[in-house]
Every structure is written in structure tokens, then in C-alpha cells.
């Protein structure tokens, strides 16, 4: 069966999500999920009907939250589908390329490689910012540039002046995609205000993180209407199931937004607690994080990761040497994780 698959697929290494990696324990801080399990109501009477391609209530609700026009919003099965749509819509297989800046989210390359689109990488600088000269030198045949801010796994914000420079150098050349999956934790750092000046800018959003709806798989692409209309040509006819649209709309209601903001305050306090506790440990560096996770460097990161794993505390090993990414959980989970790491190092 393997030999029947396309050559690109045969050579493909699948993205190792937290669930694929597995593990066994009672503290799960490896997927940047929210610890909050919120309840929603659902009307089961509509399940015999197909969903609308772009449910108006959901589109209007997210447009109001993001402070854009409804025609600037597209909803999809998570932000991952948004990534795939952008690559499929703007890149010719075996001709065009995407560009991204590791260390960063792994699905950009997977989405491109799956359909035979070349991937170009320009590593981030030592302080995890864009290497603009290297990016400019690599733009030949590049149709889509992906930038994650706050970046996963490093947690930092990409400098706004560098984003502006990138947008200027890619005018009439490529689409710039800002992955803002974690921007709800620092909305003042969003690039949504730049949509008015840059028609080649697209912004990815999700309800998986701050809204505590990772299992719902509901994401959004924000862009100018012309770009959104291109994506609507390639999206599936029923991308958002009826239950997803209904629950997501509830999450974006006045009451839902108030709950989300309260829970974000709780997570921010837990992040500060975890950061302060880890920083004082010997041989530990905690990088500033703007999302619901922290990147932590140890003298031997693999050893800490494995010891925690064996103890039922599931963290995320990082491709960055000796670094482990720790999602921010509830206070009990943070206390247990911090206590375990402290006992390992002292």
C-alpha cells in the first residue's frame, strides 16, 4: 500500500502532536491546552441538516471580537486548516515555495510538503527574532511566509518593526501569514490593525487556547475580502459542523467572553507563579512567555523531561537543545510540576 502513495507522502514525516506522542499520567502540560472544562448548550434538532459553509452568527461574533468586518473573516476546522488553505490557494506544486523561521510550529512544512510545495527555512536569530536580510535573500519563488507570534515554542513576540519590514519587502510577491494562535493572551500585540494597509496579510486565530475549546477544532483566518474570497474557492463545502458553530458562537457571546477573560487572568497568574518558581532553581533559564506556556532550559533537558514523564507529569520536549516546553495548567498542576522539578534539581 505504501508504494501506491504519492512520492511526497511516502517521504513525509507526520507532525507528532501531543496526542500522537501519548504518555500516561495525571498532569498533562504538553499541548498548550486550557485546564478549564466549560459547559455549553446544544440543540440536537439540527443534526439532520448540513451546516452552512460560513455560519453568519459565528462569523459576525468573531468579527466583533477581532474588531474587523465580517467579510474579513473565514472560519475553518482549526487554524491548521487555515494553514492548508493558504498553501493550496497560493502555491503551485513543484514550482512555488513557502518560507518559515524555525524553531516554530511544525504544521507549516507538513501542509506544504503534502502537496509538493517546497519549504524554505530561515532560522530565527539568537534572540528569536526575524533574520530579515536572510529572509529577503530567500524570497525567490516564495508565495507564502509564515510567522508565529507569540512564537511556539519559544513564547516570544516578534518585533512589530520587523513585521512591518517583512510586509514591505513582500508586497506583490508573497502572502505574509501571522499565526496568532496565542494572541488572546496579549491582544495588544496583534497585527490585526495592519490589515487596512497590507492586502497581502493574513492572520490565523483559534479557539483552542484562551477559549478552552481545543477539542472543538474551530479556527479563523482574518484578511481583506479579496484574499478571503480566494480561500473560499478551495475550502470544503461544510467545513464547520453544526455543533462547532453553535458552541463557538456561545463562547463568543458577552458571557462567554467575560468567562474567557477571567480564566486568562487565572492562567496569567499561574504562569507568573511557575516562572518565578523555576527561575530560582540552579541551572535553569526561563524564557519570557506571552502565551499559555513557558520554554525552560535545563542543564539536561532530556533527563528532566523523561523523569517527569516517568512520574506522570507529561511535558513537551523541545527541538531546542536542553529545552522543555511547559503548558500553564491550573494551580494544582503547576504546584505539582514545580515541586517535582525542584526535587530533581536540588
From Swiss-Prot:
Cofactor: pyridoxal 5'-phosphate
N6-(pyridoxal phosphate)lysine: residues bearing it: 209
Alphabetic keyword roster: Amino-acid biosynthesis, Aminotransferase, Histidine biosynthesis, Pyridoxal phosphate, Transferase
GO terms for biological process, alphabetical: L-histidine biosynthetic process
Family annotation (InterPro entries): Aminotrans_II_pyridoxalP_BS, Aminotransferase_I/II_large, HisP_aminotrans, PyrdxlP-dep_Trfase, PyrdxlP-dep_Trfase_major, PyrdxlP-dep_Trfase_small
Reactions this protein catalyses: L-histidinol phosphate + 2-oxoglutarate = 3-(imidazol-4-yl)-2-oxopropyl phosphate + L-glutamate
Record EC number: 2.6.1.9
EC class: transferase
Pathway in which this enzyme or protein is active: Amino-acid biosynthesis; L-histidine biosynthesis; L-histidine from 5-phospho-alpha-D-ribose 1-diphosphate: step 7/9
Keyword Transcription regulation applies: no
GO molecular function: histidinol-phosphate transaminase activity; pyridoxal phosphate binding
Entry's family note: Belongs to the class-II pyridoxal-phosphate-dependent aminotransferase family. Histidinol-phosphate aminotransferase subfamily.
Subunit description: Homodimer.
NCBIfam families the record matches: hisC
Protein name: Histidinol-phosphate aminotransferase
Species annotation: Aliivibrio fischeri (strain MJ11)
Gene: hisC
Amino acid at each position: 500500500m505504501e508504494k501506491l502513495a504519492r512520492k511526497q507522502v511516502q517521504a513525509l514525516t507526520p507532525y507528532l502532536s501531543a496526542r500522537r506522542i501519548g504518555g500516561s499520567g495525571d498532569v498533562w502540560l504538553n499541548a498548550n491546552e486550557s485546564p478549564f472544562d466549560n459547559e455549553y448548550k446544544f440543540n440536537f434538532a439540527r443534526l439532520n441538516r448540513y451546516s452552512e459553509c460560513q455560519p453568519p452568527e459565528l462569523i459576525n461574533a468573531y468579527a466583533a471580537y477581532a474588531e474587523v468586518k465580517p467579510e474579513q473573516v473565514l472560519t475553518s476546522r482549526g487554524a491548521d486548516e487555515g494553514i492548508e488553505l493558504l498553501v493550496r490557494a497560493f502555491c503551485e506544486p513543484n514550482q512555488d515555495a513557502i518560507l518559515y523561521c524555525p524553531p516554530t510550529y511544525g504544521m507549516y512544512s507538513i501542509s506544504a510538503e503534502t502537496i509538493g510545495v517546497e519549504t524554505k527555512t530561515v532560522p530565527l536569530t539568537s534572540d528569536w527574532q526575524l533574520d530579515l536580510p536572510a529572509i529577503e535573500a530567500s524570497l525567490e519563488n516564495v508565495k507564502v511566509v509564515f510567522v508565529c507570534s507569540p512564537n511556539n515554542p519559544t513564547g516570544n513576540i516578534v518585533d512589530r518593526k520587523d513585521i512591518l519590514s517583512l510586509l514591505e519587502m513582500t508586497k506583490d510577491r508573497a502572502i505574509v501569514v501571522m499565526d496568532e494562535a496565542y494572541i488572546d493572551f496579549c491582544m495588544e500585540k496583534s497585527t490585526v490593525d495592519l490589515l487596512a494597509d497590507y492586502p497581502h496579510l493574513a492572520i490565523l486565530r483559534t479557539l483552542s487556547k484562551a477559549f478552552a475549546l481545543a477539542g472543538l477544532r474551530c479556527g479563523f483566518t482574518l484578511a481583506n475580502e479579496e484574499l478571503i474570497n480566494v480561500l473560499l474557492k478551495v475550502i470544503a463545502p461544510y467545513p464547520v459542523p453544526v455543533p462547532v458553530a453553535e458552541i463557538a458562537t456561545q463562547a463568543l457571546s458577552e458571557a462567554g467572553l467575560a468567562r474567557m477573560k477571567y480564566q486568562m487572568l487565572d492562567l496569567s497568574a499561574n504562569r507568573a507563579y511557575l516562572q518565578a518558581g523555576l527561575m530560582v532553581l540552579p541551572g535553569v533559564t526561563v524564557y519570557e512567555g506571552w502565551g499559555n506556556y513557558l520554554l525552560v532550559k535545563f542543564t539536561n533537558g532530556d533527563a528532566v523531561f523523561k523523569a517527569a514523564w516517568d512520574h506522570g507529569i507529561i511535558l513537551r520536549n523541545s527541538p531546542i537543545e536542553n529545552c522543555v516546553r511547559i503548558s500553564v495548567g491550573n494551580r494544582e498542576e503547576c504546584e505539582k510540576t514545580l515541586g517535582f522539578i525542584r526535587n530533581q534539581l536540588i
